[in-house]
């Protein structure tokens, strides 16, 4: 517990070198469906998003620098190791311009008056699509929403207006991924 910060019940410990950070432009060359996470802070949510991305056909996960570290032990654990399977990279400040230059259309998951439903056929028809998810609580920045091609909402019942970012990502990846 002195080394890890918590009690191990299974007696296993592994020390690894961090992988070299990937270039997002190179990572996106052959991708058609990617997740963009803007400032997702909770490592549990981050791990769950990686697991959903792996299971539901996303080619990569792209992160802003202010979010949680995918290699944080809780994120790795919740992801069931998929942070080592799904390619990921940190994005530059002008990431929307990078995605657009590489031919991606961007879909901001946000509750706005002009939001289209997740099942809008235009979204699934896009050859290259980035699904953009925001931080817990605050969601996406207004500037991010304005820079995206689509604003998208998940239709819901019983007066519920939003889902946790990990749950919303699973729904969005299922609808828009390569399943």
Regions found by a protein language model. Name each.
Residues 1-2, 9, 19-22:
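A short acidic, glycine/proline-enriched capping/turn motif at secondary-structure boundaries
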Residues 1-4, 105:
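N-terminal positively charged helical leader segments and presequences
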Residues 3, 98, 118, 162-166:
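Short, charged, surface-exposed secondary-structure boundary motifs
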Residues 4, 73-75, 101, 117-122, ...:
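Short, well-ordered secondary-structure micro-motifs
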Residues 11-14, 52-56, 67-84, 142-179:
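Structured adenosyl-cofactor binding patch, chiefly the S-adenosyl-L-methionine
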Residues 16-114:
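RNA substrate-binding interface of SAM-dependent RNA methyltransferases
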Residues 108-160:
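Active-site/ligand-binding-proximal alpha/beta "capping" segment
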